[in-house]
């Protein structure tokens, strides 16, 4: 633990904690200051001026990052309208129909996304208390309840990911890997920020985006200059 703290302290050297950096520079610094031995994530945290007790100020959806985020998303497809072979052909990791739902609780640590259609949702409702807190409950807002299951699988395997505000109005997301080209991570970040700006609720007053920070899986957080509020 002491060794990690020492590495983290060293990683902060050369970074002005009071300064906000241009987005490209912040990403580059986060890549350079990562202290993991593996190819860690580059993450973005966006603080928004939202009152999340109001439903209209709770943001949730999904986005296809231009360059993906480097994560292998494990997809479970629940459908009786397509075959296992069709699902596998577009990259699904697991597949089943109504009788497969009983297996889900045993494999929560093996799946990242469940994609299904509206017909299956009543059967999944009984697992709401299990799937909801883990962010696994399919939802049409994020494209995981759809009539075109095969297309949705392709999109999520290519890098479509969910975004949502937490209780405090923050959005946290992985936007790439340390090994990515900096420009590609910047492109991902700009795509997300553009989407967030487009989703600004009409009832929000004052500065909408209050803070942006970039950080590696392990390493310092770096403030970003906020533009176009």
Swiss-Prot record:
Disulfide bridges in this chain:
none
Q: Name one Pfam family in it.
A: Ribosomal_L1
Q: Does the keyword Repressor apply?
A: yes
According to its UniProt entry, one GO biological process term is: regulation of translation
Return the InterPro entries for the record. Answer: Ribosom_uL1_bac-type, Ribosomal_uL1, Ribosomal_uL1-like, Ribosomal_uL1/biogenesis, Ribosomal_uL1_3-a/b-sand, Ribosomal_uL1_CS
Q: Which UniProt keywords apply?
A: Repressor, Ribonucleoprotein, Ribosomal protein, RNA-binding, rRNA-binding, Translation regulation, tRNA-binding
Any one annotated GO CC term: large ribosomal subunit
What terms describe the molecular function in GO for this protein? rRNA binding; structural constituent of ribosome; tRNA binding
Q: Which residues form the signal peptide?
A: none
Q: Which domain of life is it from?
A: Bacteria
rRNA-binding among the record's keywords? yes
Family (UniProt): Belongs to the universal ribosomal protein uL1 family.
This chain's protein is named Large ribosomal subunit protein uL1
Gene (UniProt)? rplA
